[in-house]
Amino acid sequence: MNRMFRVLGFWTGIFAVMFYLGDMKDASLLFFGQTILFVFLSYLNLTERMYIYIFGAYLTIFFAGFTYYSIFIMVPGGGGH
């Protein structure tokens, strides 16, 4: 299970670099933070159950934050195209 957290760290790192190259600095910093978190957690050698609990908590926080952002902060049609 710790290898899967390294895989998550790898992919969030890839997304962070792509966001940075696309001049999306806030998203880039968010994904760099997630990369550091996932790689750090992968080297703790926890039990598989603990990794599942941590991932479940991560998903819960992400879904709540994304829902809050999309309802209260995001401006519909604000892309400027």
Curated annotation (Swiss-Prot):
Source domain of life is: Bacteria
Looking at the keywords, is Cell membrane present? yes
Keywords, alphabetical: Cell membrane, Membrane, Transmembrane, Transmembrane helix
The stretch of residues making up the signal peptide is: none
Localisation per UniProt entry: Cell membrane
List GO terms (cellular component aspect).
plasma membrane
Transmembrane residue ranges: 27-47, 54-74
* Entries under InterPro entries matching the protein: DUF2626
Q: Does the keyword Heme apply?
A: no
Name-wise, this protein is Uncharacterized protein YqgY
Give the species.
Answer: Bacillus subtilis (strain 168)
Gene name of the encoded protein: yqgY
